[in-house]
A protein has these predicted regions:
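Beta-loop-alpha module in the N-terminal Rossmann-like domain of NAD(P)-dependent dehydrogenases
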Residues: 43-106
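A contiguous active-site-proximal alpha/beta segment in oxidoreductase catalytic domains
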Residues: 71, 94-156
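Rossmann-like dinucleotide-binding domain that binds NAD(P)(H)
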Residues: 151-221, 227, 240-241, 303
Length: 328
């Protein structure tokens, strides 16, 4: 399999490094000749160019990975797919549902694989958390919540919802196993007028499940945590932990046998199952290569990526409408 990587800023070189272990990185593309020279040295077999057209005109190129600015994702992904190349595009898929639908349609019409780089869905800890839910070990899931907090980086072109929320929405949808029908969001702009630095989100699902997100780049803590509260047990995935990334709490309420129908708190064992120490990006890139080879639908395929954009767009509407509930 021959693949080209487009965009050699912060993330693109990581994609090139991982894909080079799985396939032939045949092209590197970036608007900066200096970046091409610097990163091309690590991939001596790759041709370099400042024009995407050169990749699309290469009849022997199988796939293109896009790590370009968010505002270019949809347009470039559609071009790649229309040129009948398989496409890996970093998250989010698009900046609007309308854009995302065009990309998904291009993938369907071309018969090519479209995969969105929702990296956390490929983290072994998130996969183990999903297995805890699906196995019933946690009981009936009551609610989910996530915190993605840090001090910085302030972005002039997008708010905390769009900058940080794609990570958490993709994971919460995977853990929930369903799509929300309604959401609300409230945010505040402290550092830049009209650009929310902190956002609180609430998602409601058809099954009765609820999920909450706290997103902020104006916080003293660096936190990347997901919590699942079940009727039998509770569990957290904390990506900032080096050793105990996944923790299961045998905590909850047991109904007493008194005639008053009271509930008694239960605080049992706390366990930390071992999470395999494999780089999520390596797993993600391997998944893309395998789906190109077998023609299967990726875990974070076009439709899944579109679902994330649909939720983000609904949350943005709620932000703009004074936290009014917005249908998804």
């Amino acid at each position: 399999m021959r693949i080209g990587v487009v965009g050699l800023g912060y993330w693109g070189p990581n994609l090139a490094r991982n894909f080079s272990r799985l396939a032939d990185v045949a092209w590197l593309c970036d608007a900066s000749p200096e970046r091409l020279e610097r990163h091309g040295a690590a991939h001596p077999g790759a041709r370099t160019t400042t024009s995407l057209d050169n990749l699309l005109d290469d009849g022997d190129l199988d796939a293109v990975a896009l790590a370009t600015p968010v505002l270019t994702h949809a347009a470039l992904a559609e071009r790649v797919l229309r040129a009948r190349k398989h496409c890996f595009v970093e998250k989010p898929l698009a900046q609007s549902v309308e854009e995302g639908e065009r990309v998904v349609a291009a993938a369907r019409e071309s018969g090519r694989v479209l995969m969105v780089g929702h990296l956390l869905e490929y983290h072994p800890g998130v996969e183990m958390l999903k297995q805890l839910i699906d196995s019933g070990e946690l009981g009936d899931v009551r609610y989910l919540y996530s915190n993605r907090l840090n001090l910085g980086v302030l972005r002039p072109d997008e708010n905390a919802l769009w900058s940080l929320g794609a990570h958490d929405v993709s994971v919460l949808l995977r853990l929930a196993g369903e799509e929300p029908y309604e959401c609300r969001a409230v945010g505040e702009s402290y550092m830049q007028e009209g650009i929310e630095d902190v956002v609180f989100c609430y998602l409601r699902f058809p099954s009765g499940l609820a999920a909450h997100m706290h997103l902020s780049w104006l916080d003293p803590h660096k936190e990347r945590r997901f919590t699942v509260v079940g009727s039998r047990k509770m569990a957290t995935f904390d990506d900032m932990e080096l050793e105990r990334k996944l923790t299961v709490y045998d905590k909850g309420f047991d109904e007493s046998f008194s005639s008053y129908g009271e509930y008694i708190a239960r605080s049992g064992d706390i366990s930390s199952p071992r999470v395999p120490n494999e780089e999520p990006l390596a797993i993600e890139c391997r998944h893309f290569v395998e789906r190109v080879q077998d023609g299967g639908e990726p875990r974070s395929g076009g439709e899944a990526g579109l679902r994330v954009v649909r939720v983000l767009e609904a949350l943005q509407r709620s932000l703009q409408e004074s936290s009014r509930a917005a249908p998804v």
